[in-house]
UniProtKB/Swiss-Prot annotation:
HAMAP family: SmpB. InterPro entries: SmpB, SsrA-bd_prot, SsrA-bd_prot_CS. This is SsrA-binding protein. Keywords: Cytoplasm, RNA-binding. It is found in: Cytoplasm. Residues 131-159 are annotated as: Disordered. It comes from Rhizobium leguminosarum bv. trifolii (strain WSM2304). GO terms for cellular component: cytosol. Residues 137-159 have a biased composition (Basic and acidic residues). PROSITE patterns: SSRP. Pfam families: SmpB. One of its GO terms (molecular function) is RNA binding. The keyword Lipid biosynthesis does not apply. Belongs to the SmpB family.
């Protein structure tokens, strides 16, 4: 139990996949729990994680996080975890069914957006149902972003 004077940080983001919003068109987001070992949680609490190259996949009616990197916890000894192991995601049956049908039918992908700790101290992941952008879509969104920046600069200078 935490000491009386300590304040717990709510929704502390541990890892974020920044390129996801550039490379994919986000259709819908879901909050999923993570099945982790003790050393993985300690490594996450230190703020060490990388989900930039990871994705989620459906296997046997369950959703698994693949290719995420949680480095070994340095104070752990032989009971340490494997850094790139597959991790099970906890979602409701209805959500799993909805995600499976969207991925199979419409050719969408499941990508993690961020890992954070909720107000109860549980590790959670924001999972996105997304569709990959083509090169011209990426260029278009970049032009739009640049134009919005220019507009705000002009309004700031003139206003």
């Amino acid at each position: 139990m935490a000491p009386k004077g300590s304040q717990r940080v709510v929704n502390k983001v541990v890892a974020e996949n920044r390129k996801a919003r550039f490379n994919y068109e986000i259709i819908d987001t879901y909050e999923a729990g993570l099945v982790l070992m003790g050393t993985e949680v300690k490594s996450l609490r230190e703020g060490k994680a990388n989900i930039a190259e990871s994705y989620a996949s459906d296997e046997g009616g369950e959703i698994w996080l693949i290719n995420s990197y949680l480095p070994e916890y340095l104070q752990a000894n032989r009971f340490n975890h494997e850094p790139r192991r597959r991790r099970k995601l906890l979602l409701s049956g209805r959500e799993i069914h909805r995600l499976r049908s969207a991925v199979n039918r419409e050719g969408m992908t499941l990508i993690p957006l961020k890992i954070y700790f909720n107000d109860r101290g549980r590790a959670k992941m924001e999972l996105a149902l997304a569709k990959g952008k083509k090169l011209h879509d990426k260029r278009e969104s970049e032009k739009e972003r640049d134009w919005n920046r220019q507009k705000s600069r002009l309004l700031k200078d003139n206003g």
